[in-house]
Each structure stands twice: as C-alpha cells, then as structure tokens.
C-alpha cells in the first residue's frame, strides 16, 4: 500500500501556453476590387430606393409591380422629404450586400476576380 501513496500522480497541471499578439491588417482589402464591388452595389440599391426606383416603406408595389404611394405602415417617422426611413436603409443595405456577394462569388467562380 505504501507504493501507491508515493507514486507520482498521473495528472499534472500544465502550464498555460504563452499568448502572442496578433496584428490584423486590411491593407489588401481597402480599395480592392472586392471592396469596390461591395461599395458600388450597396450604394446603387440605397440610391435606387431613395430616388423612388425601388420599393420602400412609403412606396409599395401592386400586383402588376407598379410603385404606388401608401401610408407609412411601419410607423417610423422620418424627416426625409422622400420619406426614406431607417427601415429602408437597413433593407436596401442588406439587399445591396446580397447583390455584392453574388457578384463577387460569381466573378470568383469564373476566375475573373
């Protein structure tokens, strides 16, 4: 029984690994073709909605896909003369990002990017 008591334990605490600092840089992204595509697609969808070329909270579509003015069903108040709200900004920003991702992945798929 004495041998069991003096045997070193099988579980030894391990030292924590040293952490090294990691530097993340965006040098290759700012101004790259991917960045320009994302900026252009988001800007295009926001501009289309702001200037009445796409549906917004204030401009809904009919069954024939015509834009018609309607009352603000979202209940969001806007000081913008065209009635552009934060709901429109978020929706069109998401649509622009989706469009941009599709363009980038399509161009990468055919090897053009």
Swiss-Prot record:
GO terms for biological process: photosynthesis. The keyword Cell membrane does not apply. InterPro entries: PSI_PsaG/PsaK (IPR000549), PSI_PsaG/PsaK_dom (IPR023618), PSI_PsaG/PsaK_pln (IPR016370), PSI_PsaK_pln (IPR017493). It is a multi-pass membrane protein. Pfam families: PSI_PSAK. The chain crosses the membrane at residues 29-49, 86-107. GO terms for cellular component: chloroplast thylakoid membrane; photosystem I. Keywords: Chloroplast, Membrane, Photosynthesis, Photosystem I, Plastid, Thylakoid, Transit peptide, Transmembrane, Transmembrane helix. Its main location: plastid. It is found in: Plastid, Chloroplast thylakoid membrane. Residues 1-26 form a transit peptide. It comes from the Eukaryota. NCBIfam families: PS_I_psaK_plant (TIGR03050). Belongs to the PsaG/PsaK family. This is Photosystem I reaction center subunit psaK, chloroplastic. It comes from Chlamydomonas reinhardtii. The gene is PSAK.
